């Protein structure tokens, strides 16, 4: 006679860490940290060698431990590093420009009592005009409820990972390069979409908790004095990541057919802004074309923003 006992670790303040990946985020991260309960451990992965940033954070906040990566790892790799450093079963990933409401964590803990089978759980944006999730086709009216409901995808700026559940789900994958939580081939954009799709494809569940609300400043993670450089980087990586995501999950042909019109339009706009000598727009559309070209020939996501002051 074999008796199987299933143990489920519950979410509590002691069993939940906050993870924030940063780069040039000094101007916004303090709002984020101050919105988090002081008794909760916070892991900050700073994608640079900025020791002053680390010292200032750890001096000001006793619940913060900052790790320097010494180079810009990007979001996926930075999150993987932070998750590996965490000692809790649950990790809430936040962008530094996210602000929790007073009861956000409490509502997440309460929701756990009714949905223990989740791999990923997400709070919801307080502004209902900008949903941070995509619904399943059969669940289109779930937004009407206050109860947690299943979705097929959540945005990466606020997502709670059930580490043990994810490890079990992702162990079904055979590709050696996918043993991390996030696929590190993504430097920026769609690493969260990729993780969500892998979870769903392998039988996992993703939920949104409507009572757990957050505010997102949106595109404010990096100091605004680097706005142009951030914009150049975003345009390169969005096109590269979109092609890579589609190729990975749907094949090269779909990725090419969907991406080529953007590539052609980017070339046209690049030439136009070259003629009228608009350097910023010229660079944006050059980067879009470059991102597509590099993705099609199989080059890695190599572009890095230049933040030299």
Where are the regions a protein language model picked out?
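Short, well-formed alpha-helical segments that are part of the catalytic scaffolds
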Residues: 19-38
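A conserved acidic beta->alpha catalytic loop
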Residues: 35, 46-54
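Short beta-strand/loop segment that forms part of the nucleotide-sugar
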Residues: 40-49, 67-69
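Conserved donor nucleotide-binding strand/loop of the catalytic core
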Residues: 57-77, 83-85
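Short aromatic/hydrophobic "clamp" motif used to bind/position activated sugar donors
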Residues: 91
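Non-catalytic, C-terminal membrane-associated alpha-helical segments of glycosyltransferases
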Residues: 233, 237-240, 252-309
